[in-house]
Amino acid sequence: MSLFNLPKVDLGEDCEGGVUARPSSSSSSINNASDESTPLISKTNDEEKANIGISSTSNSPQEEQTKKPLFISILTLLISIPALVGSUCWPVLIASLSGVAVSAGSVELAHSLTFAITLSILSNLAQYHFHKCKKRPSDRGHWIKFGPFYLTAIAVPLATFDILRHILVDNSIWTIHSFISPAAYRPGCENENITCLSVMGWFSAIVFTYTGYACLLVGTIWAADLIPKIKKVWTQLRPSKKN
C-alpha cells in the first residue's frame, strides 16, 4: 500500500483550503432556542387576540341586555303620556289639542289599541325581568333577587286599570248603575279637569296610573343595575382630590 494513496475526504461547502468551519455549540443552541420560542410567542399573541375578541363579544350582549329593558320602558312611557295627563290615549289627546271632534267609534278603537299595546309591552317586560332576576345572586335575600320583577308585575295592572275602565264603559259593561260607579268625574261638575275628579277618577287616573309607572321605572332601573353603573362612571369622571 502506497503512502500517497490516501482516502478522499468530503470537505463540504463550508471548507476552503482544507480548513473547515465547525459551527459552535453555543450558536446552534441559541438558534434552536429562538426557533422554539417563535411558535410560543406567536401562540401567546394568538391567545391574547382571542381573549380580546371574547371580551369584546361578551361585553356587547351585556350592553344589549342593559339597554333593552330601558328602551322598552321609555317606549311604554311615551305611549302612556296621554294617560298621565288624563286623556287616556294619543288620538284623544291630539284631537283635544287640535280642537278636532272625534267620533265615539274612533275613541273606542283608540282605547282598545292603547290597552292592547300597553298590556303586551308591560307583560313581556315583566317576563323579561323574571328571567333576568333568576340569574341574579341570592345571597342577599329573596326580595333583593326578585325585587325588579315584583315591581314590574305590580305595574302591569295598575298602569292598565284606567284604560280598561274606559273600555268597559265604552261597551256598557261597567255602568253608573253598578255597585261601584266607573264615572271619573263628579255629577254636576261642568269642567272635566282634576278639580272635578270623583273618588274613582282619583284612584284610576292618578293613584293607580302614577303608582304603576313609578313601579315600572324603579323596577327597570333596578333590573338594569343602573345606579351602581352611574356611580362607577361618576367616580371615574370626578377628578381625584389631592390632599
Curated annotation (Swiss-Prot):
Q: Which domain of life is it from?
A: Eukaryota
List S-S links within the chain.
none
TM segment ranges: 74-94, 102-122, 144-164, 199-219
Q: Where is the composition biased (Polar residues)?
A: 30-43, 53-63
Would you name any one GO CC term? membrane
Answer whether the UniProt record assigns the keyword NADP to this protein: no
Localization in the cell? Membrane
Topology in the lipid bilayer is annotated as: Multi-pass membrane protein
Alphabetized UniProt keyword annotations: Membrane, Selenocysteine, Transmembrane, Transmembrane helix
For this entry, the protein name equals Membrane selenoprotein
Which taxonomic lineage is given here? Eukaryota, Amoebozoa, Evosea, Eumycetozoa, Dictyostelia
